[in-house]
Curated annotation (Swiss-Prot):
Subunit composition and interactions: Homohexamer; trimer of dimers.
Gene symbol of the encoding locus: moaC
Gene source species: Bacillus mycoides (strain KBAB4) (Bacillus weihenstephanensis)
Highest taxon above the source species: Bacteria
Pathway where it operates: Cofactor biosynthesis; molybdopterin biosynthesis
Sample GO molecular function, one term: cyclic pyranopterin monophosphate synthase activity
Assigned EC number: 4.6.1.17
GO BP, one annotated term: Mo-molybdopterin cofactor biosynthetic process
Identification of the protein by name: Cyclic pyranopterin monophosphate synthase
Length: 161
């Protein structure tokens, strides 16, 4: 089992020792989405959701989630993040309204920020759901995935379309 970095010689979980890894600039971009009804789209667009400004609150939730990733993902190292940016874009087709979520995370350290970006994207989508569920519980959170990452000994990664 020693080929798995998160297991010790006894096959038990461990946090990987990163003290010998080189400190480099590391970035990650993760994406998610949430499919909503026209009613929810209109209410978000006109700031008519009873709980407040959905996108502003979801953006803050995403930033907070990135900062707290090591608290909820057991083997993630606590990181000093240099920046977190949560952005939104609407994609409309016929009667479908999809809120696209993109999260960019940056640090300078000895481990990557992929999990921070993915956690932030997930928390952002979950926050939109939470704030809008009184209007309609049928919203669908879409795929959450890593779009790209830079830095580290394994090099850069860019997701194929």
């Amino acid at each position: 089992m020693s080929s798995f970095t998160h297991f010790n010689d006894q096959g038990r979980a461990k946090m990987v020792d990163i003290s010998d890894k080189k400190i480099t600039v590391r970035t990650a971009i993760a994406c998610s989405s949430i499919l909503v009804t026209k009613e929810i789209f209109d209410k978000i667009s006109h700031n008519e959701i009873g709980k407040g400004d959905v996108l502003a609150v979801a953006q803050i939730a995403g930033i907070m989630a990135a900062k707290r990733t090591s608290d909820i993902i057991p083997m993630c190292h606590p990181l000093l993040l240099k920046g977190v940016d949560v952005s939104f874009d609407w994609k409309q087709s016929e009667e479908q309204y999809r809120l696209l979520i993109e999260v960019k995370v940056k640090t300078e350290g000895s481990t990557g920020v992929e999990m921070e970006a993915l956690t932030a994207a997930s928390a952002t989508a979950l926050t939109v759901y939470d704030m809008c569920k009184a209007v309609d519980k049928g919203m669908i959170i879409g795929e959450t995935y890593l779009l790209e990452k830079t830095g580290g000994k394994n090099g850069d990664y860019i997701r194929n379309s």
